[in-house]
Amino acid sequence: MMDSRLKLIQDWLLQLLAEMTVSDPDGNEHEVFLVDIEVHSNKTIDIIEVFADTDSGISVENCKFLSKHISAELDASEEMQALLPRHFKLVVSSPGLSRPLTMNRQYKKNIGRLMQVTYQNADGEIKTIDGRFISLEEEAEASITLDITKIQKSKPNAKPKPPELVTIPFSQIQKAIVQVEF
């Protein structure tokens, strides 16, 4: 698929979702944001994968609602019909835990969680660290701070270790993935 076509589809979806909201089980409205879009083609069909979220998470029911809405809008849009002249399959889902974080909004909702971050340090070395994500700085040079203190089983009378904090500018982050805790 051509990059310019993907960009047009992505821009159209961004505009479509810009004012969208979904409801949680309590009836509260949440603004939807587009995390990523992937378009794959084979000989007979285009597959459009839309990864959407809200600041409080997105449910399967929300994804079904979005899928129906986006599909109806794609079918009704002459612009999209020109970009998708053949059959397409639309898949709407949450980004899931295995996908890297790509937006500040995703970072905000994951404060307090364990993360694995791959970044390029000031010396140009690629490093990967695990730690608890404790803060997000959005002013000046945007960055995240992790507590990389090793979690050890507490021994009686053991003195707790002081936090070992690492701050990483967004410009150095190559990949940040939330880790599953058991």
From Swiss-Prot:
Compartments (UniProt record): Cytoplasm
Coiled coil feature spans: none
One GO CC annotation: cytosol
Top-level taxon of the source organism: Bacteria
Annotated GO biological process: ribosomal small subunit assembly; translation
Magnesium among keywords: no
Keyword vocabulary terms for this entry: Cytoplasm, Ribosome biogenesis
Pfam family, any one: RimP_N
Main location: cytoplasm
InterPro entries (alphabetical): Ribosome_maturation_RimP (IPR003728), RimP_C (IPR028998), RimP_N (IPR028989), RimP_N_sf (IPR035956)
UniProt similarity note: Belongs to the RimP family.
UniProt function note: Required for maturation of 30S ribosomal subunits.
Name of protein: Ribosome maturation factor RimP
Lineage of the species this protein comes from: Bacteria, Pseudomonadati, Chlorobiota, Chlorobiia, Chlorobiales
Gene name of this polypeptide: rimP
